[in-house]
Amino acid sequence: MKKLTYLFLTILIIACSDDEGNPCVYSPTLVTDAATNVTETTAALNGVINIVSENCDNPNNTEQGFVYATNTQPTTANNKVNVNGTDINTTLENLEPNTTYYTRTFLTNVFGEFY
């Protein structure tokens, strides 16, 4: 009976230990360059998405690229163009003439939405 009690207590202590290891640190850096080759209806976009991830699994279902809108802080609820990679670029077409657009790089995954 003593051995059984000892075994039970050992299992209980191990099961209740607070050993969660190192915490996940997920820190993306996003850069949006000024638009180039701007015409009345097109604009070339360039940016950089650099992900620093320590002790985290790489998330699935990641979306990244550019968002754009006529408001100063576009989000994924506005227009978006998905572009994969670290150094990213695309050309927006069919823009409204004589309209100012604002752009940002974006990254969305289980860790959140980043701009």
Protein language model annotation of sequence segments:
Residues 4-14:
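Sec-dependent N-terminal signal peptides
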